[in-house]
Amino acid sequence: MYDDLYCKVFVDTDMDYEKLFALLINCIDGKKEAVNYIITEWCDISVQKNKEYNVEQYLLDSTDFLYWKYYLDIEPHNIEESQYIKNIANLLSCLKGCCKGVIIACDFEDEVNGMM
């Protein structure tokens, strides 16, 4: 069992914000709650433009995810831990099929990466 199920996901994509937002809604069968907020039966996702995004830094090293254009803040609700982790892995698989890069940062990242 993990003490904290909060999850941050960095996303590297050329998609504009609206396309990424729509993709996320489709990937998780979510509902738009606010301009940058998606809700589902199992989680809430805040979709953020990364304030640290830096084109020059990105061009120097596109693998440095701290400078990617977007990130997601994900909080679980009303779900068992094991199912939540599976759902996160499914979300990341969906994103990896459409984005240049996806990096997860959380207490259970090794478990998620092992499922993909």
Residue spans for each PLM region:
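Short, intrinsically disordered low-complexity segments
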Residues: 31-80
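Short, extreme N-terminal segment that most often corresponds to the first beta-strand
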Residues: 1-30
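N-terminal low-complexity, intrinsically disordered segments
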Residues: 1-4, 65-67, 71, 78-82, ...
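Structural motif
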Residues: 10-15, 75-78, 107-108
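Acidic, proline/glycine-rich low-complexity IDRs
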Residues: 86-116
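A common structural junction motif
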Residues: 25-34, 92-100
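Short, catalytically relevant binding-site loops at active-site mouths
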Residues: 16-17, 42, 110-112
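Short amphipathic alpha-helical segments
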Residues: 16, 20, 80-87
